Design a protein with these regions (language model features):
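Alpha/beta catalytic cores of nucleotide-metabolism and tRNA/nucleoside-modifying enzymes
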Residues: 1-31, 111-112, 176, 183, ...
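Bateman/CBS regulatory modules and CBS-like beta-alpha motifs in cytosolic regions of diverse proteins
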Residues: 36-53, 58-60, 89-131, 136-138, ...
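Active-site-adjacent beta->alpha loops and helix N-cap segments on the catalytic face
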Residues: 37, 86-95, 155-159, 204-226, ...
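Short beta-strand/loop segments at the ligand-binding rim of alpha/beta enzyme cores
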Residues: 50-57, 104, 228-238, 278-293, ...
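Catalytic cores of alpha/beta
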Residues: 67-70, 244-254, 293-311, 355-370
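Glycine-rich phosphate-binding active-site loops on the catalytic face of alpha/beta enzymes
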Residues: 74-89, 258-268, 307-325, 355-389
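Catalytic beta/alpha-barrel core
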Residues: 80-85, 110-111, 133-135, 174-175, ...
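Terminal amphipathic helices with adjacent charged low-complexity linkers/tails
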Residues: 83-98, 140-158, 188, 197-218, ...
Length: 490
């Protein structure tokens, strides 16, 4: 069969009753004037959460905590902190990501002009602050100056008041509320200032930019860091479909960009009720729901208010859902059906699971997904949770397990809820656990996947993701064709 445009290709497959996954298809090369460096990979994770690179890390306890989420955001993607943590533990992980790049300190620690230097030092010791710069307020809470490390360094009398050694407000460059990180950078460079207080219309402190962080964000990331409007890394968190969901999101809300309702069956009354509760309680927060594998399910969730749909039931390398239960659609067909069903609703699809090779990422995006979620492709790296295990033969491995594996169901209430475990006896496991080779830093993996996606889109002549999704033509490939596609006869 010749290569067909996407609509015709999937209609033919549908008419034949054939459902496809990544190894069943390849994409046709086209005349191209687009170099890999020119490709724009900007996309969205959910309705209001942007991506510079269409990658996300799976909410699994052997894949994503803060280290992985930080790495993903620095490469333009987003990490979803798993829910197999207590609320306090998940809060700390989310906060660690959000404050990793503290471009704008929204609520800076302040001191009063009437306090002594010794009193300030005592507070620093008590609260374990490792900084010594503070906006200074008067009795009416108005900004009157700035206390910095040099004021401590050159003071011989710690009983002196803050106001006697601080730099007064009249000598400090400041900016209004709403100043962007780039405008702040320009102002700080022009005036050679390391701190830039933001003041509201009444003269009260409303934020503080720190030059070291601002400079790192503006200059050091080549436009790849996925940051919010305040220059902080974007991060998401998984929540279970139970009574703790609202409390969990309420605890995380200050630092959270998106909540992901994590269920093996997203088209269920439990997911519906959790989505309804979260949208009512947090109307401005994006809520992604998953997982589903049919267009009807995706549209139903979107019409109930979901801001993104996670597609994939059973495609993961450590998932046994399809084998144990007989349900689920091969992933390419599932993504296609969900994308088609969501037309006109402006709700992105996340292709979750089944990515085995870098080329699969491009296929998922061409099929219509706005991003891909990866587990195995990121597991086994330094940034994945867990210790490196040294084997007797000298090799190094890390643990990788599905959230439906026996040990995950035993260890995590969120995992048990995700897989609908109830009743008596041992729960049905829908995943396995294994050790996988230690891969080193995930940054090397992400760099590889980024280059592969750009190269793929260049072969097709797609300068951006919208063009990739609109113009790519598909082949149905045979098993022999797939064998030929890999290295062979060597």
């Amino acid at each position: 069969m010749p290569a067909l445009d996407k609509q015709k290709f999937f209609k033919v497959m549908e008419a034949e009753g054939v459902a496809l996954t990544y190894n069943d298809v390849r994409m046709e090369t086209r005349a191209s004037e687009v170099s890999p460096q020119e490709v724009d990979t900007t996309s969205r994770f959910s309705r209001h959460v942007p991506l510079r690179m269409p990658f996300s890390s799976a909410a699994m306890d052997t894949v994503t905590e803060s280290a992985m989420a930080i790495a993903l955001a620095k490469y333009g993607g987003i990490g979803i902190i798993h829910a197999g943590l207590t609320i306090d533990e998940q809060y700390r992980e989310v906060r660690r990501v959000k404050l990793h790049l503290n471009g704008l300190i929204e609520n800076p620690m302040t001191v009063y002009g009437s306090q002594t230097l010794q009193e300030v030092l005592d507070i620093c010791q008590e609260k374990q602050f490792d900084f010594r710069s503070f906006p200074v307020l008067d009795a009416k809470e108005k900004f009157v100056g700035l206390l910095t490390q040099k004021d401590f360094d050159f003071s011989t009398d710690l009983s002196a008041t803050v106001e006697s050694v601080m730099t007064p407000a009249a000598d400090i460059t400041h900016a209004p509320v709403g100043t962007s990180i780039h405008d702040a950078y320009d102002t700080m460079v022009k005036n050679k200032k390391k701190k830039l207080p933001l003041l509201d219309s009444t003269g009260k402190i409303a934020g503080l930019y720190v030059f070291s962080d601002v400079s790192r964000i503006v200059n050091d990331n080549s436009g790849m860091y996925n940051v919010d409007k305040n220059g902080r890394l974007v991060v998401g968190a998984a929540v279970p479909t139970d009574e703790t969901a609202v409390d969990r999101v309420r605890a995380l809300e200050k630092y959270l960009d998106v909540a992901v309702i994590d269920s093996a069956q997203g088209d269920s009354k439990y997911a519906f009720s959790t989505l309804k509760l979260l949208k009512e309680e947090f109307p401005t927060l994006d809520i992604v729901v998953g997982n589903v594998s049919t267009g009807e399910s995706a549209r139903r969730l979107a019409e109930l208010g979901a801001d993104g749909i996670k597609v994939g039931q059973g495609p993961g390398s450590i998932c046994t859902t399809r084998i144990e239960t007989g349900i689920g659609s091969p992933q390419v067909t599932a993504v296609w059906q969900c994308v088609e069903a969501l037309k006109g609703l402006d709700v992105p699809v996340i292709a979750d699971g089944g990515i085995q090779e870098p080329g699969d990422i491009s296929i998922a995006i061409a099929t219509g997904a706005s991003s891909v979620m990866m587990g195995n492709m990121l597991a086994g790296t330094s940034e994945a949770p867990g210790n490196v295990i040294q084997l007797a033969d000298g090799s190094s491995v890390k643990l990788y397990r599905g959230m439906g594996s026996p040990s995950a169901l035993r260890d995590s209430a969120a995992a048990r809820k995700r897989y609908g475990v109830g009743g008596i006896g041992q729960p049905l496991a829908e995943g396995v656990e294994a050790t996988i080779a230690y891969k080193g830093s995930v940054t090397e993996m992400l760099d590889h996947y980024t280059k592969a996606l750009r190269k793929s889109m260049s072969y097709i002549g797609a300068a951006d993701i919208a063009t990739h999704q609109k113009t790519t033509r598909f082949y149905r490939i045979t098993n022999a064709g797939m064998v030929e596609s890999r290295t062979h006869d060597i």
